[in-house]
Amino acid sequence: MHATTVAVDLAKSVFQLAVADASWRVVETHRLTRTQFERWFANRDVGLVVMESCGSAHHWPRWLNAPGIEARLLPAQHVRAYVRRNKTDAADAAALLEAARASDIRPVRVKSVEQQALQGLHRIRSLWMGTRTSRINALRGFCREFGITIPVGARTGLEAIGRVLADPATAIPQLIRGTAQLLMEEIRLLQARIAQLERELTDMARMSPACKTLLSVPGVGLLTATAMVAATSGDVSHFKDARHFASWFGLTPREYSLGSTRYLGRISKRGDRYLRMLLTHGARSVLRAAKVAQGAGREVFGVRRWALDVQTRSNHNKAACALANKMARICYATLRDKEPFAEGTVPLNKKISRQAFVMPV
């Protein structure tokens, strides 16, 4: 037991502290500014600092670890259950102390500066992609108001909108035509920035052994590999097993059990929704390519064959979620063993397929 435990309710400029003794009783409370907060830890011998995993939370554990202070991040949704009565900064700090005593709450792993920078690139790309989509949809709406329909698809739609705006004979009024062309220039600029960012991700992936390993997994491309490295740094040792890793993305089924009755429902959708989205899109791509290959008479084996069998028994969406779950488990195995995924050329039956992905105890 640490002699002194400090719970910190983080904020932008005001920090609420609750200091506990060896018996977890609150003996001091402080409300400090950012400067006072840094000075307070410089003059104290602190054993453990607990904080919620929120904005700026990963910066402070790194700052505290430098002088040798242990810092622990707790999931905010689990800490919330320990808040009594009204929600205040002091109540949040006291709830952090109670949550820190619970042995069943897994702390959040602190990200490095490099991990957060890589994750930031993905967030910026998503922001630009959303902005590009909103601009394209706005131009579609303007054209539709004047009786011009634009085909679906970003690339096809942009080409059609460009032709419509360039043709003076179309029904687009001159009053809005110039502004719409400026909107088209914004879209082209966004596309150039997205392409440049993806080139930076490609250069990073070439230098990362973990990314090279992940790229060997079917359905895992540049975005999924780099996002997974940003989330885990390529180290999966803190996960108990492959199922625990898949549950971190919300790809494992919810369980409703009572007595001897056990029911597994839909996927939980907890955890990292961005990586869950990437894995699911990758699984859909693998399923579609496998179905095309099967229709062309080519041999389909391994996880692709397994996914097609699942689709035959259920439906496409369930098969895509099942394959995304399988892909997450394969990613865990490749990162754990630091070896690329080598899919065999022999078709797998149901029994062998199950044995192939059993993780050692």
What are these regions (language model features)?
Residues 1-3, 195-220, 228-233:
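Extended, structured, electrostatic nucleic-acid-contact surfaces
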Residues 24-48:
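Nucleic-acid-processing active sites and adjacent nucleic-acid-binding tracks
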